[in-house]
């Protein structure tokens, strides 16, 4: 009984850490939310964020077997690799209404082999970092909903659209960590 309560508490903590109730959303909504919690088609907030979720999924049979056994052994041996890429967002373009179904068409992915992204257009662009962390577990099927997370520089403010700022050097930019 104690083991079951411990596991339930862990599951509740994991659920609470996931932003915006992603378990209840469709895969399209899960990858199309902005920082202000709006759906992509109806919002022009910056920047867009693709949510990255790492969750161990086990079938219910394994779950029942582990809950009935006395010792709890959590498998934390999963490892992830990292690949750093860049995205440039032109704020002039994003201030206008998108012509397509999604504002994500305005993103420009720069290959990670490039030393620096292309030159800034007079302070109207902001450099962001995309972190790609696929699972090294061969049983884990790759899906589009767990590919990228857009990391936002620490110093960006809510009135960023009215007051464009110059592009910061990489050493001056602070990124949040997963």
Swiss-Prot record:
Keyword match Cytoplasm: yes
User: Which GO terms label this protein's molecular function in UniProt?
Assistant: actin binding; myosin II binding; protein kinase binding
Any one Gene Ontology cellular component term annotated for this protein: plasma membrane
Coiled-coil parts of chain = none
Tell me which positions the record assigns to the signal sequence. Answer: none
The subcellular location is:
Cytoplasm; Cell membrane
Post-translational modification as stated in the protein's UniProt record: Phosphorylation on tyrosine residues can be induced by IL6. Phosphorylation is mediated by LYN.
Task: Tell me which residues bear Phosphoserine.
Answer: 99
- Sorted alphabetically, which keywords does the UniProt record give? Cell membrane, Cytoplasm, Membrane, Phosphoprotein, Ubl conjugation
Q: What does this protein do?
A: Involved in the negative regulation of lymphocyte motility. It mediates the migration-inhibitory effects of IL6. Serves as a positive regulator of the RhoA signaling pathway. Enhancement of RhoA activation results in inhibition of lymphocyte and lymphoma cell motility by activation of its downstream effector ROCK. Is a regulator of B-cell receptor signaling, that acts through SYK kinase activation.
- Report what the protein is called: Germinal center-associated signaling and motility protein
Record organism: Homo sapiens
Underlying gene: GCSAM
């Amino acid at each position: 009984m104690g083991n079951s309560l411990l596991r339930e508490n862990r599951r509740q903590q994991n659920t609470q850490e996931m932003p915006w109730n992603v378990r209840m959303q469709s895969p399209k909504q899960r990858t199309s939310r902005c920082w202000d919690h709006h759906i992509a088609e109806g919002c022009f907030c910056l920047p867009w964020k693709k949510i990255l979720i790492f969750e161990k999924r086990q079938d219910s049979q394994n779950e029942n077997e582990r809950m009935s056994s006395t010792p709890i052994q959590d498998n934390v041996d999963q490892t992830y690799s990292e690949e750093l890429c860049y995205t440039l967002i032109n704020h002039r373009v994003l201030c206008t209404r998108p012509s397509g179904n999604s504002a994500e068409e305005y993103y420009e992915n720069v290959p990670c082999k490039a030393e620096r992204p292309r030159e800034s257009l007079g302070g109207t662009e902001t450099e962001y970092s995309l972190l790609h962390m696929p699972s090294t577990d061969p049983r884990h099927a790759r899906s589009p909903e767990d590919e990228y997370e857009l990391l936002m520089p620490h110093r960006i403010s809510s009135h960023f659209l009215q007051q464009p700022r110059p592009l910061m050097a990489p050493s001056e930019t602070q990124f949040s960590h997963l």
